[in-house]
Amino acid sequence: MKKLIVTVLTSVFLAGCSTYQKNADIPIIDTHIHLYDTTRPEGLPWPPKDDEVLYRPVLTEHFDKVSDENGINATVIVEASKWIPDNQWVLDLVKHDPNRYIGLVGSLEIGTPDFKKHLTKLSKDGRFVGIRMRERPGGDSFFENEAVWSDLQLLSDRNQTLDVLMFQYSLDDVDMISKRLPKLKILINHVAGADIEGKPADPKWIAAVQKAAKNSNVNCKISGLFQQSHRQPSPRNLSFYQSELDVLWEAFGEDRLIYGSNWPVTMRGGTYGEYLAVVKGFFADKSRAAREKFFFKNALKFYGLPALKH
């Protein structure tokens, strides 16, 4: 009996190792991390002070360690602060290591008089690749503001990118934007806002994903899996997330899925290594070409970034 248990455990261990070894020589770009400093004299708008997990300094030295431990070659930072100067603050913070910190998805309020001015200024730095829509001023009337569409058109004209957080926006919003601006590069964050419960995916969500994915300019990040789980602490087994991941794979295919973590928010659900293991597990049976696209090539193409430097 003891020998049987040892054999089973060894098999499980080797299976896990084989997944990592299969990806060991494939570079990884994490397209979704946040950096901030809670000790700044001016403070910061996010995370809130009562967040026991996130309210602490999260700086390059912290991600460097995570990155080195997990084989992450480079990263794209997503600005979570709504304060405009914080875009430049992050660019300055990471300028010492341009090979690791290769891009910034900024935070600028679309539909405001100074949007173009701020976008133009920040874009002088080639690492500033685009912006993320996070908050929705005006609520349901947001898209009735023609200035919103002018700013989105500007992004498209400049070949810059639009990340969309599925919090105050919907997949129907993404579908509408992509149809009106078919050349705008759009990236849906956090597994398209899936509510993951470890059972077959919600049919309404599936239909919305399929509708949005019909637009060739729409892409999706496999990010924030642990945060989208209704069960906490987040399950570490791939089977819990399988249904939603299968839907996204079928809808977007190997050319329009991109890897991201949502670190340090991932720490609410587990370690970075545990998160990465789930994602790698899903792609373990995919072709090498598909894994290369997902883990780094699609990110370079979408964000318009230069080839990785080793």
Please place each PLM-identified region on the residue numbering.
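C-terminal motif of bacterial Sec signal peptides marking the signal peptidase cleavage site
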Residues: 15-16
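Divalent metal-dependent hydrolysis catalytic cores, especially in the metallo-beta-lactamase
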Residues: 47-82, 101-109, 129-136, 162
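Active-site gating/metal-coordination segments in enzymes
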Residues: 84-169, 176-179, 221, 225, ...
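Histidine-centered divalent metal-coordination motifs
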Residues: 32-36, 190
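Catalytic pocket-lining loop regions of alpha/beta-barrel enzymes
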Residues: 142-258, 309
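Active-site glycine-centered loops adjacent to acidic/histidine catalytic or metal-binding residues
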Residues: 262
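Mid-to-C-terminal alpha-helical segments outside catalytic/metal-binding sites
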Residues: 4, 19-21, 26-31, 56-74, ...
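Sec-dependent signal peptide recognition
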Residues: 2-8
